[in-house]
């Protein structure tokens, strides 16, 4: 088993709401990631776009790139348009030494809309859209394989693949050799799903993991007040492992049992003015150190 522990930059700066953490520099974020003891990170909007420059900054801090988010529009735009953007994204990540590409379908998504409930207004794909999505994801998987990489699909609040039933459908419709799965604890729990059920069902397809925790009071408010995803983030519905309602110990035990090989990335979209990113990075690291034993790094 080969695992590395990383942390996403969204606790420092938020790509969907640039005002959150606008004062935080790229250098501050990666300095604090390294100081907190993480081995790598995912790519944020403030990161240098030149792989040579980015690698220089990260090498100084002994950090690596685990992956980066890619927004696909396979249900709403011509495939060729998404593929062209994907190849550029793929080549950047390949130059950075990443092995997986995080893909999430944004066709009809409400995750970036302030006035749309993440539950009431989430999209539901038609049969034709499901087929387009599945076929097109397999084609992107082929493009990833050209450079020895693979895509990992990110189930996400406010999108057409949010629930267990929707994850099941996507997995059933796609070739396991071409489409892998990203396992995100926070999005599953917030959606009302059981993370262990998903992990046990798809452990052989899970090639990337996000450890995100959920605050119970804010999670309930997300439903009862019909809040949008972005409103929920500002309200503090997400936090780091060890600070919310999720017990990560049985999840870690399941990960060990199945000999998972890859990155575990700590994530928590929060307002850095309310939740100091460095303090929360340390909080997560200290908590995970009490339940996890990582044999060696990727």
Which residues fall in each region the model found?
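N-terminal pre-domain/capping segments
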Residues: 1-100, 123, 127-128, 134-135, ...
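Non-cysteine beta-strand/loop elements that form the S-adenosyl-L-methionine
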Residues: 4-8, 66, 101-106, 204-215, ...
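Active-site beta-loop-alpha junctions enriched in small/polar residues
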Residues: 10-12, 44-46, 70-74, 106-108, ...
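Short, flexible, mixed-charge acidic loops at enzyme active sites
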Residues: 19-24, 108-118, 219-231
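Acidic/histidine-rich catalytic cores of soluble enzymes
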Residues: 41, 134-245, 295-298
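Active-site acidic/histidine proton-transfer and metal-coordination neighborhood
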Residues: 79-181
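C-terminal/domain-terminus segments
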Residues: 261-290
């Amino acid at each position: 088993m080969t695992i590395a522990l990383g942390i996403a930059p969204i606790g420092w700066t938020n790509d969907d709401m640039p005002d959150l953490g606008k004062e935080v520099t790229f250098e501050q974020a990666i300095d604090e990631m390294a100081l907190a003891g993480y081995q790598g990170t995912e790519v944020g909007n403030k990161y240098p776009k030149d792989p040579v420059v980015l690698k220089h900054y990260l090498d100084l801090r002994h950090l690596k790139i685990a992956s980066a988010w890619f927004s696909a529009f396979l249900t709403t735009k011509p495939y060729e348009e998404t593929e062209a953007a994907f190849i550029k994204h793929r080549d950047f990540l390949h130059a950075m030494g990443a092995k997986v590409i995080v893909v999430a379908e944004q066709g009809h998504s409400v995750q970036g809309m302030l006035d749309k409930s993440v539950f009431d207004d989430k999209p539901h794909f038609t049969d034709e859209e499901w087929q387009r999505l599945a076929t097109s994801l397999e084609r992107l998987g082929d493009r990833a394989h050209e450079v020895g990489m693979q895509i990992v699909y990110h189930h996400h609040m406010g999108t057409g693949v949010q629930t267990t039933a929707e994850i099941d459908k996507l997995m059933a419709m796609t070739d396991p050799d071409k489409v892998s799965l990203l396992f995100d604890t926070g999005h599953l729990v917030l959606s009302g799903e059981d993370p262990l059920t998903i992990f046990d069902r798809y452990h052989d397809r899970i090639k990337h993991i996000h450890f995100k925790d959920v605050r119970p009071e804010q999670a309930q408010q997300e439903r009862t007040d019909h809040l949008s995803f972005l409103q929920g983030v500002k309200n503090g519905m997400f936090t780091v492992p060890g600070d919310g309602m999720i017990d990560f110990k049985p999840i870690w035990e399941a990960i060990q049992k199945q000999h998972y090989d890859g990155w575990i990335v700590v994530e928590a979209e929060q307002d850095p003015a309310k939740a100091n990113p460095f303090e929360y990075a340390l909080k997560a690291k200290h908590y995970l150190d009490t339940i996890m034993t990582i044999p060696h790094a990727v």
